């Protein structure tokens, strides 16, 4: 997984941004994406801030884990990550729904978390070129109620 992101995702991000990327924001599930992409970006001439995302204490975001240090996956290299942000489940879900309604991107909760984190980083760094990856699909969450009547009744559904 890290090798695939090192050889494909990292170079694609570099190419698509014309090397202008200043911040890479990635959810930390298996940590393959953040490990592979950050390794590639660190090898480029320009410094890029690498930011990992984990659920806030007490939040549950499918696909993103709050790893205790002793249980971090063996592929993870902490020296490649500059900062770890906590994301609240509500923010991840709200961003996921906003992406569906405003942008037509039907993604899942972990992608909502990644984009919520990227928006936070962009707001704190005007003019920055911030990249996040949409890493899951919304159809996997249809039965959970995050898009449905329960959420809508609480003012959050679409």
Q: What is each of the regions a protein language model found here?
A:
Residues 3, 27-38, 110-118, 141:
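Short glycine/serine/threonine-rich phosphate/pyrophosphate-binding segments
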Residues 29-32, 54-59, 68, 113, ...:
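Glycine-rich beta-alpha junction loops
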Residues 1-29, 90-106:
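Active-site/ligand-binding-proximal alpha/beta "capping" segment
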Residues 20, 41-109, 123-124, 145-158:
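Active-site/ligand-binding loops adjacent to catalytic centers
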Residues 106-109, 129-134:
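Conserved active-site loop/cleft motifs that coordinate metal ions or position small ligands
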Residues 132-143, 147-149:
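A short, charged, Gly/Pro-tolerant segment at domain boundaries
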Residues 7-14, 35-38, 42, 61-65, ...:
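Predominant activation on well-ordered alpha-helical scaffold segments within soluble catalytic domains
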């Amino acid at each position: 997984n890290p090798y695939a992101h090192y050889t494909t995702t990292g170079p694609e991000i570099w190419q698509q941004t014309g090397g202008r990327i200043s911040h890479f924001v990635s959810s930390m599930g298996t940590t393959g994406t953040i490990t592979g992409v950050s390794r590639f970006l660190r090898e480029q001439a320009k410094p890029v801030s690498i930011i990992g995302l984990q659920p806030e204490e007490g939040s549950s975001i499918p696909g993103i884990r709050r790893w205790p240090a002793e249980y971090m996956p063996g592929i993870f290299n902490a020296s490649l990550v500059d900062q770890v942000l906590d994301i609240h489940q509500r923010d991840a879900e709200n961003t996921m729904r906003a992406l569906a309604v405003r942008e037509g991107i039907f993604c899942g909760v972990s992608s909502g978390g990644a984009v919520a984190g990227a928006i936070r980083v962009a707001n704190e760094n005007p003019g920055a070129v911030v990249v996040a990856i949409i890493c899951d699909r919304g159809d996997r969450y249809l039965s959970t109620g995050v898009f449905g009547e329960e959420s809508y009744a609480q003012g959050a559904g679409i």
